[in-house]
Amino acid sequence: EVPEAIMEDKIKAFYIMGEDTLQTEPDINAVKKAFEKVELLIVQDIFMTQTAAEADILLPATSCAEHEGVYSAADRGFQRFYKAVEPTGDVKDDWVIISELATAMGYPMHYNNTKEIWDELRSLCPIYKGATYEKMEGLGYIQWPCTDEGPEDQGTTYLYKGQIFDRPNGKAEFFACDWEPPMEDLSEEFPLVLSTVREVGHYSCRSMTGNCRALAALADEPGFVQMNDQDAKELGIKNNDLVWIASSRGKVISRADVSTRTNKGACYMTYQWWIGKCNELT
């Protein structure tokens, strides 16, 4: 929604933190136009990503090995992580950057460490209150709800203990989503469905793992377009051929990975590569 809001003059400035928007978002060409129009683009990151290269102001931050904090997970768990190495260069922790910006803009934020920030968060969220830094010391792991700061409350392993759900009758509610038709239909010009996926050896947009020599060595060539062998035969495409992949939004070049594994009528591309960026098509 942000690119549309920028084009409609509803957003004048955009602050991006730890995200390579020009790599991960659909319809990258529309995002590029929005970034060219926005009056101020600020990017806070640890690497010079494609988005960072377009920033008016670049705020260099520390990596996870250069600062401490708390990780949260999908299993409701909290775990502390610790600084492993001292940062080099003109970089600052994310919380330091945000605090200094807020203070400069008239909203004072004065913290001395991450514990003070975490304690403030706990004070505002009752189900986190008992997840203290002391309980998470070392390899400590706390799952919310954890409402008591005392040592006897070590969190909640099972959220709905006794199969009692947070509803008046104590039972879970199942419901189906309404079906929505596809935004675009197949056509004679575009007969295949493209799905964007992730490279097995890389995480998210590859800005971190792509800077790891060991992982980069596993896949040092830009990604492939995976397609069904029957579709490839009908199009005269052989395995490892360089091919153009086109949609109504643009076209990119990549190498064909032909196999029986891919469903007929479908093709797949990883969105993490700078060359052959499939999100120029989506």
Features from the language model and the residues they span:
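Non-catalytic, well-ordered alpha-helical segments in soluble enzyme domains
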Residues: 94-112
